[in-house]
Amino acid sequence: MVTQFKTASEFDSAIAQDKLVVVDFYATWCGPCKMIAPMIEKFSEQYPQADFYKLDVDELGDVAQKNEVSAMPTLLLFKNGKEVAKVVGANPAAIKQAIAANA
């Protein structure tokens, strides 16, 4: 399951966890974001040891800017509040590899 962030504080709390947290930075107008969404959902089922979230860059632009996200989709992977991997673009193979390497 992929959970939608509503606030910056939800984001901050989630990434501080002692487990892998995968955040999909997307925009509703972004075609590649829509294309990759079902794959992210599938990865969330394949990797239950990780938590999966999505963040609308138009709703939480300050969070996107703070994390230097300028292209969508961008997936950031965090552990203990630190970024451990970044995948820019709709690249399922690279996303899966980043998750597997850090799960």
Curated annotation (Swiss-Prot):
Residues 2-103 form the Thioredoxin domain. Coiled coil: none annotated. Pfam families: Thioredoxin (PF00085). CDD domains: TRX_family. The record marks G31, P32 as: Contributes to redox potential value. GO terms for biological process: cell redox homeostasis; deoxyribonucleotide biosynthetic process; endoplasmic reticulum to Golgi vesicle-mediated transport; protein transport; retrograde vesicle-mediated transport, Golgi to endoplasmic reticulum; vacuole fusion, non-autophagic; vacuole inheritance. InterPro entries: Thioredoxin (IPR005746), Thioredoxin-like_sf (IPR036249), Thioredoxin_CS (IPR017937), Thioredoxin_domain (IPR013766). It is found in: Nucleus; Cytoplasm; Golgi apparatus membrane; Mitochondrion intermembrane space. The keyword Transport applies. The record marks D24 as: Deprotonates C-terminal active site Cys. It comes from the Eukaryota. PANTHER family: THIOREDOXIN-LIKE PROTEIN 1. Present with 8579 molecules/cell in log phase SD medium. Yeast has two cytoplasmic thioredoxins, TRX1 and TRX2, and one mitochondrial, TRX3. Participates as a hydrogen donor in redox reactions through the reversible oxidation of its active center dithiol to a disulfide, accompanied by the transfer of 2 electrons and 2 protons. It is involved in many cellular processes, including deoxyribonucleotide synthesis, repair of oxidatively damaged proteins, protein folding, sulfur metabolism, and redox homeostasis. Thioredoxin-dependent enzymes include phosphoadenosine-phosphosulfate reductase MET16, alkyl-hydroperoxide reductase DOT5, thioredoxin peroxidases TSA1 and TSA2, alkyl hydroperoxide reductase AHP1, and peroxiredoxin HYR1. This is Thioredoxin-1.
